[in-house]
Amino acid sequence: MINLFLFCRAGYEKECAAEIQHRAAELDIGGFVKTNKNDAYVIFQCFQAGDAAVLAQKIKLDSLIFARQMFAAKALLKNLPENDRITPIMEALSDVRNAGELRVETPDTDAAKERTTFCRKFTVPLRQKLKNSGNLLKKESSSRPIIHVCFVASGTAYVGFSFSNNSSPYPMGIPRLKMASDAPSRSTLKLDEAFIHFIPEEEKELRLSSGMNAVDLGACPGGWTYQLVRRGMFVAAIDNGAMDEGLMETGQVKHYQADGFRFEPPRKNIYWLVCDMIEKPSRVAELIEAWAINGWFKEAMFNLKLPMKSRYQDVTTILETMATVLKENEIKNFSIKCKHLYHDRDEVTVYLSLNPTQVS
């Protein structure tokens, strides 16, 4: 395997490319990126054969900001014959044995979506052939590598594999969430996805439990508050604007008509702080830092808008600065994670946990 294939949001190829170049260099693995704007994927071609599999194993997917999914891939397969696309694909996968799952995918672009029906239909005969040849186990296994076949154009595909313990559980790394009919805005999906992505399933009952107190800075009309309320939390919603009437009728929301940058919580028993304000990312980060230094929350989820040209570098700088500020203020035990989630647009979601091993 000579290529590392990374799925990303269309328009963010440059950021994804910059990040993987940086991370590969940290491992002393040489290579170069190949990408085109709005392709929704990046190829990092290694100088040494086999290095792509090393990257796919050693670089944790959750540590990458802009990549939704990645897999080690062979050289691009071109001009696959319409009457037999399977044979060249199986030849390319000859050294992949006993994989646990097959995913036939496309990049997340409007043009590529036209191939989704083909991919779905093509999966059935390809899966059977791979099972018969021993490339794929007879029964799916979540502990074995995942075979990926990604059609980037008609008759053109990258094939390879990802490690099941370092891979998104979703095809192309995209969770399919439903918009609740009573949610005040589509922004609600961002926090829903953030909770799914950052909070392990086995810890949700403890860390997203009914009766917790939360604060939503810049809450109106209540998209993020909605996700807290539906999990049974009591929310202080901070915004000068109007809140959704349905949320207010739950009795779980107290609306403070105030500036989120000036608000100080009257009670200090807050577990969750969430914030999705259209503001300079550095200013939002400084606000979260202030709340952390004051000890006003235990876990926080917030978005940083990305109007900058050098988005990867700027986000990295903001996160590094936050870590430095927390340490300088005697906050030693914390965890910062960041991801460009599917429901994010020109923004990233940051998760900050104080004393991450102490959940109460």
Curated annotation (Swiss-Prot):
Annotated TM spans: none
Major subcellular location class: cytoplasm
Keywords annotated in UniProt: Cytoplasm, Methyltransferase, rRNA processing, S-adenosyl-L-methionine, Transferase
Listed GO MF terms: S-adenosylmethionine-dependent methyltransferase activity
Protein family according to the UniProt entry: Belongs to the class I-like SAM-binding methyltransferase superfamily. RNA methyltransferase RlmE family. RlmM subfamily.
PANTHER family, A to Z: RIBOSOMAL RNA LARGE SUBUNIT METHYLTRANSFERASE M, RIBOSOMAL RNA METHYLTRANSFERASE FTSJ DOMAIN-CONTAINING PROTEIN
Protein name (record): Ribosomal RNA large subunit methyltransferase M
